[in-house]
């Protein structure tokens, strides 16, 4: 397992764990980052990750990406 912030783009990955404080986990869940869900890193732009999750493209910063394990 490693944080999403360390992943190279292109390959879909299943999320086994979402860490952090409860408020951070809840926020990430509302964006679609749930255990068992699939996420694909599309690109990195100015320290932000562009990811596909639940048929949506979302930008998250490195701090949030560190809480999402794949």
What spans do the regions from the language model cover?
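Compact, glycine-rich, soluble single-domain proteins
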Residues: 1-70
């Amino acid at each position: 397992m490693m944080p999403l912030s360390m992943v190279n783009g292109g390959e879909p990955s299943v999320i086994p764990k979402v860490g952090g404080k409860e408020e951070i986990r809840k926020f990430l869940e509302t964006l679609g980052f749930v255990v068992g869900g699939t996420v694909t890193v599309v690109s990195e732009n100015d320290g932000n990750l562009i990811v596909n999750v639940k048929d949506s493209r979302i930008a998250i910063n490195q701090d949030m990406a560190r809480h999402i394990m794949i």
